[in-house]
């Protein structure tokens, strides 16, 4: 009777519990596919585990943070008024303003004037003549429009700029004369340009107004004589011979109305022995022979036409 009574079925979770909690595992377990459905949580955990796992020989990954943009802030001084520095101030001054400032400083400090004189470069012939031409331009621009430019009225109108030109001429001329100027070519070049400026001085109807012009010719003539004498002492006057100064001085004498005749005579006396027999009274035939020999020596043709004796003397 008892064998026919059916035993109640055991719930499945009892089997699961007994399988996982068995103290004696089987020596040869048989892997069978589990019929239990996998949950989504299990899949996520397995995926995270596989992704987080890394080989033992791979370098560790260290996260890097992106550089944050740096902000540069330039410090600005407080805005307030201040005077210009000396270099910037000098940049704003023109030539006339600089001359005025330098002149006033030299007048107040004589020691500074000596330093400026020794520090400044030596004026050249070009720069000196340019200054004289600037005064000449100012003189020409001072003439009144219309009327007689040779009248006393015109003379009174241009008297001040005329005096400025003559004063500048008197100051610059001694600078280019010996012994202050040792190069005869420099002195002659200046005198040539200065004489041209004197030729351009206006002529007046009144003789008394022409006294200043005549005095300028007398001073420049004395300067010509001094330079010619010094140039004749150096190198046999070669600067006078090959510079064409005899022709230039003759032209200046003609334009001045004969007021440079003393300089022309001095040049003739200094170069008389260098000219040939066809010179304008500068030399004798003997001096012409000396000049011919000198020309042959300078050209390298001396003695080429002389016959050479062969055999016993």
UniProtKB/Swiss-Prot annotation:
InterPro entries per the UniProt record, alphabetical: Cut8/Sts1_fam, Cut8/Sts1_sf
Subcellular location: Cytoplasm; Nucleus
Stretch list, region Disordered: 1-79
GO biological-process terms attached to the record: nuclear protein quality control by the ubiquitin-proteasome system; proteasome localization; protein transport
MF term (GO), any: proteasome binding
Polar residues bias (residue ranges): 20-33
This protein's UniProt keywords: Cytoplasm, Nucleus, Protein transport, Transport
Record field: compositional bias (Basic and acidic residues): 39-50
GO cellular component: cytoplasm; nuclear membrane
PANTHER family (alphabetical): FI02826P (PTHR28032:SF1)
Family the UniProt entry places it in: Belongs to the cut8/STS1 family.
Functional summary from the UniProt entry: Involved in ubiquitin-mediated protein degradation. Regulatory factor in the ubiquitin/proteasome pathway that controls the turnover of proteasome substrates. Targets proteasomes to the nucleus and facilitates the degradation of nuclear proteins.
Quaternary data: Binds the proteasome.
Protein's name according to its UniProt entry: Tethering factor for nuclear proteasome sts1
């Amino acid at each position: 009777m008892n064998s026919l009574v059916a035993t109640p079925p055991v719930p499945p979770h009892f089997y699961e519990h007994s399988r996982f909690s068995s103290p004696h595992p089987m020596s040869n377990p048989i892997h069978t596919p589990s019929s239990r459905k996998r949950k989504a949580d299990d899949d996520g955990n397995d995926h995270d585990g596989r992704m987080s796992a890394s080989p033992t020989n791979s370098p560790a990954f260290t996260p890097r943070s992106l550089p944050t943009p740096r902000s540069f802030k330039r410090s600005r001084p407080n805005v307030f008024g201040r005077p210009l520095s000396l270099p910037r101030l000098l940049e704003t001054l023109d030539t006339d303003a600089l001359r005025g400032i330098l002149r006033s400083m030299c007048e107040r400090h004589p020691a500074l004037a000596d330093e400026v004189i020794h520090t400044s470069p030596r004026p050249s012939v070009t720069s000196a003549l340019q200054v004289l031409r600037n005064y000449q331009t100012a003189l020409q621009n001072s003439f009144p429009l219309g009327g007689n430019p040779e009248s006393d009225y015109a003379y009174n109108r241009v008297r001040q700029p005329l005096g400025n030109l003559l004063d500048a001429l008197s100051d610059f001329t001694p600078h280019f004369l010996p012994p202050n100027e040792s190069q005869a070519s420099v002195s002659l070049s200046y005198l040539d340009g200065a004489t041209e400026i004197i030729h351009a001085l206006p002529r007046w109807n009144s003789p008394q107004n022409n006294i200043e012009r005549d005095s300028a010719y007398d001073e420049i003539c004395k300067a010509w004589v001094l330079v010619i004498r010094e140039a004749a002492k150096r190198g046999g006057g070669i600067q006078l011979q090959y510079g064409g100064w005899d022709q230039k001085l003759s032209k200046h004498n003609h334009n001045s109305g004969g007021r440079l005749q003393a300089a022309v005579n001095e040049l003739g006396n200094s170069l008389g022995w260098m000219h040939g027999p066809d010179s304008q009274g500068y030399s004798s035939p003997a001096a012409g022979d000396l000049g011919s020999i000198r020309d042959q020596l300078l050209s390298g043709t001396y003695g080429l036409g002389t016959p050479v004796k062969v055999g016993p003397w």
